[in-house]
Amino acid sequence: MIMEKAVIDTDKIGVGVVGIGLMGSSICTCMLIAGHPVIGLAPIPVDLEAVKLRICNDLDEARREGIITQPTQYYLDHLLLTENYEDLAPCSLVVECTLEDLNIKSGVYQKIEAVIAEDAILTSNTSAIPITLLQQSVKHPGRFFGLHWTIPAFTSRFLEVICGDHSEVSKGEYLCELAKYWSKEPTFVHKDIRGFIANRLMYAMYREACHLVEEGYASVEDVDRACRNNTGYWMTLAGVFRWMDLTGVQAYHAVMKDLLPDLNADPSIPTLIDDIVKAGGKGVANGHGFYTYTPEEARLWEETYKEFSFEIRKLALKYPADVVKRKLKS
């Protein structure tokens, strides 16, 4: 595989996606839009026609939003859905999207490595398992990385490329270059750490949010309202460090001395979410989460989130990370 920062011909780079549930199928859509031939593999028997319909619907929506211009069938012609690992043989890149279970992933890696070339890159979409730990399950740890996506994969600008202790950095840099063809602003995580970057930031917020509700400081609705109208207002333009620069670093320095010791640092799962899960709650999926949902409300929330993802994508593209550099050049 050519490891250069020149123009990359995505149509010559076959991509395998192993595990084609909601996330895996969304990644398939992203790769098809980027021009890759895609092999979507179901490691356990599934209704492949249902998966194809999901990808087809994603492509239809992408076309309506102007993300793609070719007919949906043009992209589907570059997609193979299968349950046969041997079909992964021509892939230069494989993305594993199976359950967050080390034993399951280890078995999947053995089957993948039995058929792909030695110079093919193998990645995992894990959001919780350290990449270095997963590298212990593969024959060629140097070519193994984390690729942490968010859903919808074909509209979000987010992607983390994570090195394990044994990853070859040059291959990670190549993945970051390739990710730009997927319409990503990739984050390169140089050192392996549990949760990577985005999850560590977000789970600190989730813990504090649960604490504020459990201790009676605010309701679920009010915590959500504060997030939507504060961080939700600026975070697409500026990350946390840029925001502190914009609004005065010295102010945050002054507040940290007194506030940081007062923040919740309990390592146990918050009672608020624990009670919901023990009662069978899954959120919108079954109508029972921090809020309750009728079937129609659940459907409309999912529909609205998808609609919002297209709108926020347009805003993110208008204000990319280098927006000021572009203005200086104009």
Region locations from a protein language model:
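Structural/interface elements that position substrates and couple domains in central-metabolism enzymes
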Residues: 202-208
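Rossmann-fold dinucleotide-binding core
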Residues: 121-199
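Rossmann-like NAD(P)-binding element
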Residues: 46-50, 61-121, 129
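Structural motif
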Residues: 18, 41, 82, 97, ...
